[in-house]
Amino acid sequence: MSLLTEVETYVLSIVPSGPLKAEIAQRLEDVFAGKNTDLEALMEWLKTRPILSPLTKGILGFVFTLTVPSERGLQRRRFVQNALNGNGDPNNMDRAVKLYRKLKREITFHGAKEVALSYSTGALASCMGLIYNRMGTVTTEVAFGLVCATCEQIADSQHRSHRQMVTTTNPLIRHENRMVLASHTAKAMEQMAGSSEQAAERMEVAGQARQMVQAMRTIGTHPSSSAGLKDDLLENLQAYQKRMGVQMQRFK
């Protein structure tokens, strides 16, 4: 896996699924291929994206700034600076300075990533902020190691909370989680519909699922009643995708 492919993988792992994720993936590909060289327009686009957390925007802004060649005097963006200030916690800044000193001694992506992984997300974000604000300099490879370590920590915490949600023993939470997942699957089906032959059928199944979830929420049902809902939807989606030769993984 090339360095830029690895960076793209880690960064996309913290972006919520949906049309925006596909758009960001395309922007990253263009930036890494040298096809998008207007940093100012790119940052303006990023600033106005919905759904993304401030930290995710900050990380993406940092990656774009590292990669796109720009004029030396180009102003730093406030939304990136605010996201990479470690929540204003002086402890994060102290740790960030210590981490920065260690990163100065590193020369490889993997070396930098390994060093960075032992720090908290707040300290990692603050360290990115130091570099972004030109208060310190490291090689691009080392900066990317810092980015990937931060994304890995964020993705790990998201995965842990997802696992806790799945294994929770509270039937009401499990019931709601199944309905949320069913809704998301229906949304994915609608987004994939396009103008294919199966589009009408897929839209119909997705619409029925949405109605079912809405009805279950409106009238209230026993928690066990939603058990098969998500699985039925996933099976339908998988069947349609198989027919079209599209892989299923991203919707599991």
Curated annotation (Swiss-Prot):
Where mainly located? Answer: virion
Q: What is this protein called?
A: Matrix protein 1
Q: What does the subunit comment say?
A: Homodimer and homomultimer. Interacts with NEP. Binds ribonucleocapsid by both interacting with genomic RNA and NP protein. May interact with HA and NA. Cannot bind NP without genomic RNA.
Which biological process terms from the Gene Ontology are attached to this UniProt entry?
Answer: viral budding from plasma membrane
Annotated source species: Influenza A virus (strain A/Budgerigar/Hokkaido/1/1977 H4N6)
- Quote a single Gene Ontology cellular component term: host cell nucleus
**Family membership noted in the UniProt record:** Belongs to the influenza viruses Matrix protein M1 family.
- Classification via SMART domains: Flu_M1_C
Statement: the UniProt record of this protein carries the keyword ATP-binding: no
One of the Pfam families matching this protein, by short name:
Flu_M1_C
Gene that codes for this? M
GO MF entry, a single one: structural constituent of virion
Q: Describe the task this protein carries out.
A: Plays critical roles in virus replication, from virus entry and uncoating to assembly and budding of the virus particle. M1 binding to ribonucleocapsids (RNPs) in nucleus seems to inhibit viral transcription. Interaction of viral NEP with M1-RNP is thought to promote nuclear export of the complex, which is targeted to the virion assembly site at the apical plasma membrane in polarized epithelial cells. Interactions with NA and HA may bring M1, a non-raft-associated protein, into lipid rafts. Forms a continuous shell on the inner side of the lipid bilayer in virion, where it binds the RNP.
Presence of the UniProt keyword NAD in the record: no
Which segments carry the region annotation RNP-binding? Answer: 165-252
